[in-house]
Design a protein with these regions (language model features):
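A SAM-dependent methyltransferase catalytic signature shared across enzymes that methylate proteins
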Residues: 8-14, 210-227
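Short glycine-rich, flexible loops that bind phosphorylated cofactors or substrates
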Residues: 156-157, 188
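Short, glycine-/aromatic-enriched active-site segment of Class I SAM-dependent methyltransferases
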Residues: 181-206, 211-215
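Histidine-centered divalent metal-coordination motifs
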Residues: 152, 156, 204
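Helix-to-beta-strand junctions that scaffold the AdoMet/dcAdoMet cofactor pocket
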Residues: 157-159, 173-175
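Short, conserved loop/helix-junction motifs that constitute active-site signature segments
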Residues: 110, 171-174
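A short beta-strand-loop micro-motif that forms or neighbors metal/cofactor-
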Residues: 175-184, 225
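Conserved N-terminal segment of class I S-adenosyl-L-methionine
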Residues: 1-151, 163-167, 181, 230-234, ...
């Protein structure tokens, strides 16, 4: 029996996808999201915890958080700045955990350490001592922020929780503020990491599809854009004033002030630029290959 989707709220569109640790996950045929059984989502919205953010959780996550802060986390932060269509004077890491990324950005860009901020609702006992590390929610902060990242967070959140986060970001954003989200999206789960759905150990309950994300974000003034070739990240912009003809303009023609900021730590600029460019052309190559194969199949089916 098909069930209703908690993400896009379409009725009877959720098909059984898989079972993990005795929890059933469903796939929405409308918004593509993969979500845990709705009873769990309802219980979480009522205050129950499937996987709490206690010290045992952080003990298992701190190593991964530290590794991300020195590698792909830095690349995602650099990309957010590179893609921004407004000058980045204030940057925020949302759901920052222990604040390792904040510390790394401060080390790489010491002359701009005050530019970077982080916020975390459920911090571990040991966390960053940076003065811009704040315990709380995005809505608690004084804006505006020009850019930011939210890395490995929303897969833990119910649609209602994500909506509250979106409302908070809207409060601290201005026109063209950009937020890059790093999360395992449905294509990533299906084709790259089926084990990403992990209710007990990591608390991953939903893989949000882009159509579902658009329904959630657009209501609050955000435009959602896919990142070419990346099945693990997307960007949202608040009340955007620009529309680019092609995504490549974001990395080939960034705002001069933002490129200058990244070039303060040259490797950060290169990491962001090459990540954007390589995945972009990988996506282009895949599309052209699929087109060529489809054309070949069509021609083979035609009588000579």
């Amino acid at each position: 029996m098909n069930i209703d989707c908690p993400v896009c709220t379409s009725e009877g569109v959720g098909e059984t996808y898989c079972v993990v640790d005795d929890f059933t996950y469903y796939r929405c045929t409308v918004c593509e999201s993969i979500f845990i059984e709705p009873e769990v989502i309802i219980a979480m919205d009522c205050g129950e915890q499937l996987r709490g953010y206690d010290q045992n959780y952080w003990k298992s996550e701190l190593r991964a958080a530290r590794q991300r802060s020195r590698s792909d986390g830095l690349a995602r932060a650099g990309e957010a700045i590179l893609y921004a269509r407004r000058e980045v004077r204030r940057f925020l890491d949302v759901g920052a955990g222990p604040g390792y990324l904040l510390d790394q950005l401060g080390l790489l860009l010491p002359a701009h350490a005050d530019l970077f901020h982080a916020v975390e609702m459920f911090p571990p006992e040991e966390h960053s001592s940076h003065p811009n590390y704040i315990i709380g929610a995005a809505a608690d902060l004084q804006g505006p922020f020009d850019a930011g990242v939210c890395i490995e967070v929303i897969e833990h959140l119910t649609p209602a929780m994500l909506t509250e986060l979106i409302k908070g970001l809207a409060l601290i954003s201005e026109a063209d503020s950009i937020w890059l989200f790093n999360t395992g999206m449905p294509n990533y789960v299906r084709h790259e990491d089926p084990g990403y759905l992990d209710p007990r150990k990591r608390g991953h309950i939903i893989s949000y599809g882009v159509p579902g994300l658009r329904k959630l974000f657009e209501h609050h003034g955000f435009r959602v854009s896919e990142l070419p070739g990346k099945s693990f990240a997307f960007i949202v912009e608040y009340r955007p004033t620009t529309s680019l003809s092609d995504f490549s303009e974001r990395f080939y023609a960034p705002l001069p002030a933002n490129k200058k900021l990244l070039n303060t730590a040259g490797l950060l600029y290169l990491a962001a630029f090459e990540s954007a460019r390589s995945y972009y052309f990988q996506a282009q190559s895949k599309q052209r290959t699929e087109w060529a194969l489809a054309l070949e199949a069509e021609l083979r089916g035609q009588p000579r």
